Design a protein with these regions (language model features):
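Conserved RNA-binding domains used in RNP assembly and mRNA/RNA metabolism
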Residues: 1-53
């Protein structure tokens, strides 16, 4: 399932699209596969998640 994640970084809202690899509840990260590889986002920085497919 392809998703778009909006997240807060450096005072701006950024967006990234990809596929969920895993949610690490111990470290509080979302691991996301995107075009250039694996991307990690802190759960506390996520502002919105949309399903694209």
């Amino acid at each position: 399932m392809l998703i778009e994640v909006s997240y807060f970084e450096g005072g701006y809202i950024r967006k990234i699209s990809g596929y969920i690899h895993k949610v690490d509840t111990n470290e509080q990260y979302l691991h996301l596969y995107e075009e250039t590889g694996l991307f990690k986002i802190r759960l506390s920085e996520i502002t919105e998640i949309k399903c694209l497919t």
